């Protein structure tokens, strides 16, 4: 299993997280999931400055993103 954001492979006993339903599931490693959770929190609370910082962090982590991840990110967390 690989992370759809950074392309990292699952290690032994490592938990991967998923977002979405059905065929649109996006898988995240724990590090990428942490940034996504922060983006959700920033968006819900209206923190534009933190939202921008976490957007930058997610872009830096996305070294080898899947096309499904890019579509999901643009739909849910546009720049």
Residue ranges and their predicted role:
Residues 1-4, 15:
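Intrinsically disordered, low-complexity boundary segments flanking structured domains
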Residues 3-6, 29-32:
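Short cysteine-rich clusters marking metal-coordination/redox-active sites
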Residues 6-7, 21:
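Glycine-centered signal
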Residues 10-11, 36:
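Cys/His-rich microdomains that often coordinate metals
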Residues 13-16, 39-41:
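Short Cys/His-rich "knuckle" micro-motifs
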Residues 14-26:
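Short linker/helix segments within small regulatory modules
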Residues 30-42:
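Short Cys/His-centered divalent metal-binding micro-motifs
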Residues 40-79:
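Short, intrinsically disordered terminal segments enriched in charged and Pro/Gly residues
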